[in-house]
Amino acid sequence: MVKMNVETREELASLIDHTNVRADATENDIERLCREAVSYGFRCAVVTPTNVRLAAELLEGTDVTVCSVVGFPAGVSTPRVKALEASEAVENGAGEVDMVMNIGAMKSGNRELVYRDISGVVDAAGVPVKVILETAYLTDKEKVEACLISKEAGAAFVKTSTAYGGLAGATVEDVMLMRKTVGDEMGVKASGGIRDLETALAMIDAGADRIGTSTGVQIIEGWR
C-alpha cells in the first residue's frame, strides 16, 4: 500500500491542492489563491472552469498546476457535457481535472453509464483526472465499485468528496478503503473537512497522496 513519508512542511505542501471553488469567488480571490499556491509550494490551484484561464495566466512559469473541477458539484451533467467542459478547461490551461461522477447512476447500479461518464472525461482531457466519488452518498460496496470503475476508465486518482452542500467530507476509513481497493496504481485524494495539520497527516497516513483543502495556508502554518 502507498504510504507517504512526510518529513518536512515542503513535502506536505507538495501534496496539497489549494482550493477555491466557491460560487462567489472573485478575481481577487483567485489572485490570492494563486499567490498563496506559489508562495507555499502547493501542488495545484483548484478553481471552477470560469476561473481556469485567469489562474493559468497567473501561474504561468511556476511549478503550480491549475486544476479545474468538472460536473461540479452534483455530477449530474451528461457524459458529453462533462467531456466538453473538461476539454475546454484544458484548452484554457488546466493541467489536471477533478470530475464529479454520476452518483445517481452509481446508486442505480448502472455501471455502463458510470464508466462512460468517467472515460469520456479522461479521453477528452488528456491530463490526469481525479474522480470525485462523493463518499457520503455511497455504501462501502458502492465505494469499492466506483474505485474499480474509475481505475478501469483510466482515471489517475479517486477522490473522496466535494464537501459541498453540507455533505460529510473525507474520513480516514474511506481513504483506507479506497487505497486498499486501487492499490499502488492510482492516487487517492482526500478532500472535505481537512482544515488542520493533524487531520491532513491522518489522511496521508491512511493512504492519501493528495489533500484537497481551502485552508492549505493554515495547515502549513501549523507545521512546527
UniProtKB/Swiss-Prot annotation:
Record-stated family: Belongs to the DeoC/FbaB aldolase family. DeoC type 1 subfamily.
Pathway: Carbohydrate degradation; 2-deoxy-D-ribose 1-phosphate degradation; D-glyceraldehyde 3-phosphate and acetaldehyde from 2-deoxy-alpha-D-ribose 1-phosphate: step 2/2
Reaction(s) catalysed (UniProt annotation): 2-deoxy-D-ribose 5-phosphate = D-glyceraldehyde 3-phosphate + acetaldehyde
GO molecular function, one term: deoxyribose-phosphate aldolase activity
Species: Methanothermobacter thermautotrophicus (strain ATCC 29096 / DSM 1053 / JCM 10044 / NBRC 100330 / Delta H) (Methanobacterium thermoautotrophicum)
This protein's UniProt keywords: Cytoplasm, Lyase, Schiff base
Keyword hit for Nucleus: no
NCBIfam families per record: deoC (TIGR00126)
One annotated GO biological process: deoxyribonucleotide catabolic process
Official protein name in the record: Deoxyribose-phosphate aldolase
Biological role: Catalyzes a reversible aldol reaction between acetaldehyde and D-glyceraldehyde 3-phosphate to generate 2-deoxy-D-ribose 5-phosphate.
Gene: deoC
TM segment ranges: none
Active site residues of this protein: 98 (proton donor/acceptor), 159 (schiff-base intermediate with acetaldehyde), 189 (proton donor/acceptor)
Record-listed E.C. numbers: 4.1.2.4
InterPro entries the UniProt entry points to: Aldolase_TIM (IPR013785), DeoC (IPR011343), DeoC/FbaB/LacD_aldolase (IPR002915), DeoC_typeI (IPR028581)
